[in-house]
């Protein structure tokens, strides 16, 4: 069985440390721990790394389409590698959770997250795993766009980093046992 873990974010130095790039940050850490490097796959508008974990093929994917068009990269990769959407996990930022809180879900709506909305639209299914990493709500007077495209202030940086570590620990646990429900039970 082949699995794919996608980290959502925006490409480019300008966005590298923004809240919206929590998925990219978590996937970068996971790739580092698995000792794999990303290579650009231009036809798929993505950075892709691949390896084997417990004898199963694993693809790590960072779409280069910008957040709101992530599905345009993810759907063709699933089709090309013949991966079922149930074996897809998407890591992303979550406005509705406090900074650093990690929540795992097996299916559901986008919850207003435009990258997830794009994946649902292009994949044609809501039945894929999600790892939501909390970034909190905007402070009074700040727009959602400005909030997600800003970095973490000093008091939240460490908490956000802890969330990234927890998300990666959850993914390593999932890759070891292959059971997302069991992973949810342990990490939610």
Curated annotation (Swiss-Prot):
A GO term from the CC aspect: cytoplasm
KW Transcription (keyword) present: no
Residues annotated as the enzyme's active site: 20
Molecular-function annotations in GO: peptidyl-tRNA hydrolase activity; tRNA binding
Catalytic activity: an N-acyl-L-alpha-aminoacyl-tRNA + H2O = an N-acyl-L-amino acid + a tRNA + H(+)
Subcellular location: Cytoplasm
Discriminates between blocked and unblocked aminoacyl-tRNA, annotated site positions: 10
Keyword terms of this UniProt record: Cytoplasm, Hydrolase, RNA-binding, tRNA-binding
Residues reported in the UniProt entry to bind tRNA: 15, 66, 68, 114
Record's keyword annotation contains Cytoplasm: yes
Enzyme Commission number(s) from the entry: 3.1.1.29
Family per similarity comment: Belongs to the PTH family.
Known function: Hydrolyzes ribosome-free peptidyl-tRNAs (with 1 or more amino acids incorporated), which drop off the ribosome during protein synthesis, or as a result of ribosome stalling.
Subunit structure: Monomer.
Descriptive protein name: Peptidyl-tRNA hydrolase
Origin species: Lactococcus lactis subsp. cremoris (strain SK11)
Phylogenetic placement of the source organism: Bacteria, Bacillati, Bacillota, Bacilli, Lactobacillales
Gene name of the record: pth
């Amino acid at each position: 069985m082949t699995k794919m873990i996608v980290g959502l974010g925006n490409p480019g130095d300008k966005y590298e440390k923004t809240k919206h790039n929590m998925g990219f940050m978590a996937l970068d850490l996971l790739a580092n721990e698995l000792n794999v490097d990303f290579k650009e796959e231009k036809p798929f508008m993505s950075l892709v790394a691949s390896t084997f974990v417990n004898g199963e093929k694993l693809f790590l994917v960072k779409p280069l389409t910008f957040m709101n068009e992530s599905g345009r990269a993810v759907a063709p990769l699933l089709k090309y590698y013949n991966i079922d959407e149930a074996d897809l996990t998407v890591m992303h930022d979550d406005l509705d959770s406090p900074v650093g809180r990690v929540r795992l879900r097996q299916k559901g709506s986008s919850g207003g997250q435009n990258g997830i909305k794009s994946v649902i639209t292009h994949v044609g299914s809501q039945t894929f795993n999600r790892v939501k990493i909390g970034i909190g709500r905007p402070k009074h007077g700040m727009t959602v766009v400005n909030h997600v495209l800003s970095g973490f202030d000093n008091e939240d940086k460490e908490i956000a980093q802890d969330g990234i570590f927890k998300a990666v620990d959850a993914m390593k646990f999932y890759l070891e046992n292959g059971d997302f429900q069991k992973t949810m039970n342990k990490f939610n």
